[in-house]
Every structure is written in structure tokens, then in C-alpha cells.
Amino acid sequence: MVAVGSTLPKVTLWENKPEEVVEFPSQGKFIIVGVPGAFTPPCSSQVPGYIANEKQFAAKGISGIYVVAVNDVFVTKAWKKSFDGGEQSGVHFVADWNGEFTKAFDAGFDASGLLGPLRSKRYAAVVENGKVVKVFIENEVTDVDISSADKVLSSL
């Protein structure tokens, strides 16, 4: 599983449209929020905290927040639009459509019974200069506690 000291895998991710490839910053501090699936109730309850606290995260030195879901880019774009203030926020909703990032980051689990074969575990990772410096992994993928925006923000 993703751990402190892990480096970010070099894989392709997308935002907004298939032609818009996302690259995580190589310098600075940012947060990756891994979620099992767009529009699922627990994920949809977790993400608004990151949108609402975007300025508070910036005040603590966070240059970006990237919500990564094993969904296609059209789904992640629609999901961002579904949140109050989502479209206007600087929070990135990133599609890991084939799960390549999730697998390489060792953050996947088999959700065949409900969401499909591969989904991301629920976590938040603080990344600085390309390395994970803090990680918040939920014990159960349906839980939203350890990786909540409030808990991550209070740790910074």
C-alpha cells in the first residue's frame, strides 16, 4: 500500500477531456485523494470537505488537491460539476480510467461484487517534491474518517 517515502508512479491520468493529460507537480506540496468511485455516497460525502477547505489547505502550503478515481474522464468531470462550488474550485478531479496509477501506487482493491474489478482504496496522501510525506488510509473503503479533509488539514 502507498506509504511514506513512496514516489509517484509515472503514468498517464486525465482531467476534463481525453486530450487533457495531468502531470503531478515535481516540486512543492500537494494532496492526492484516492476514492473508490465517483458518485458513490461515501466518496460524494468526502470530497466536499476538500473543496470547502481549499483556501485553508493553501494557507498551510498545499499547492493543489487531486481527487483520483478509477473512472473515465467524462464521469470525473460530471462529478466535479455535481458539487456546490466544484466547477469554480481549483480542486482537480482526475481520471485513472484503467487503474494504472492506482495499481502502480499499490492502492487498489478488488470491488468485483459492486463497482468492478479494480477500484482505489480510500486514502489521502500529502506529497512533497515527488515523495509521499504523510498518508491517511481508511481501514474500510466505506469509511470517511482518517482521510477526511478535516483530519488531513489538522495534521499539516
UniProtKB/Swiss-Prot annotation:
SUPFAM superfamilies, sorted: Thioredoxin-like
Keyword set, alphabetical order: Antioxidant, Cytoplasm, Disulfide bond, Nucleus, Oxidoreductase, Peroxidase, Redox-active center
Thioredoxin domain residues: 2-156
Compartments in which it is found: Cytoplasm; Nucleus
GO molecular function annotations of the record: peroxidase activity; unfolded protein binding
One Pfam family this sequence matches: Redoxin
GO CC annotation, single: nucleus
Positions annotated as active site in the UniProt record: 43 (cysteine sulfenic acid (-soh) intermediate)
Gene Ontology biological-process annotations: cell redox homeostasis; cellular response to oxidative stress; hydrogen peroxide catabolic process; protein refolding
Keyword presence, Nucleus: yes
Record's keyword annotation contains Metal-binding: no
InterPro entries referenced in this protein's UniProt entry, alphabetically: PRX5-like, Redoxin, Thioredoxin-like_sf, Thioredoxin_domain
Similarity-based family: Belongs to the peroxiredoxin family. Prx5 subfamily.
Remaining remarks: The active site is a conserved redox-active cysteine residue, the peroxidatic cysteine (C(P)), which makes the nucleophilic attack on the peroxide substrate. The peroxide oxidizes the C(P)-SH to cysteine sulfenic acid (C(P)-SOH), which then reacts with another cysteine residue, the resolving cysteine (C(R)), to form a disulfide bridge. The disulfide is subsequently reduced by an appropriate electron donor to complete the catalytic cycle. In the typical 2-Cys Prx5 family, C(R) is provided by the other dimeric subunit to form an intersubunit disulfide. Pmp20 lacks the resolving cysteine residue.
Biological role: May act as a chaperone rather than a peroxidase. Has no thioredoxin-dependent peroxidase activity. Shows weak chaperone activity.
Oligomer and partners: Homodimer; disulfide-linked, upon oxidation.
Name assigned to this protein: Peroxisomal membrane associated protein 20
Species this chain originates from: Schizosaccharomyces pombe (strain 972 / ATCC 24843) (Fission yeast)
Lineage, opening ranks: Eukaryota, Fungi, Dikarya, Ascomycota, Taphrinomycotina
